[in-house]
Amino acid sequence: MANIKSQIKRNKTNEKARLRNQAVRSAVRTEIRKFNAAIEAGDKDAAQAQLRTASRALDKAVTKGVFHINNAANKKSNMATAFNKLG
């Protein structure tokens, strides 16, 4: 347990940020999971809609500082490749 006042404050701030980041990360993972389910089902229209929402969620997460921009770009690229393979 921290004794220094500034570190006690930082611990509170870090915990709030951790919970916020966890929620955003979970939401992004859910969108990617929905996209993968649409790909597995072979539903091109649903996959296209999910690709759009998942990409949007990733971009928002980058803006909030949860994901690095290159990490999000790689995830979007992998999803686009999977979508294009769907035919």
From Swiss-Prot:
Q: Which GO terms describe its molecular function?
A: small ribosomal subunit rRNA binding; structural constituent of ribosome
- Which UniProt keywords are present, listed alphabetically? Ribonucleoprotein, Ribosomal protein, RNA-binding, rRNA-binding
Q: Name one GO biological process term.
A: translation
Checking InterPro entries in the record gives: Ribosomal_bS20, Ribosomal_bS20_sf
Q: Does the keyword Nucleotidyltransferase apply?
A: no
Q: Which residues does the annotated region (Disordered) include?
A: 1-22
What are the annotated GO cellular component locations? cytosol; small ribosomal subunit
* Family designation: Belongs to the bacterial ribosomal protein bS20 family.
Q: Which HAMAP family match?
A: Ribosomal_bS20
User: What function is annotated for this protein?
Assistant: Binds directly to 16S ribosomal RNA.
Name recorded for this polypeptide: Small ribosomal subunit protein bS20
Q: Which organism is it from?
A: Corynebacterium glutamicum (strain ATCC 13032 / DSM 20300 / JCM 1318 / BCRC 11384 / CCUG 27702 / LMG 3730 / NBRC 12168 / NCIMB 10025 / NRRL B-2784 / 534)
Q: Which taxonomic lineage is given here?
A: Bacteria, Bacillati, Actinomycetota, Actinomycetes, Mycobacteriales
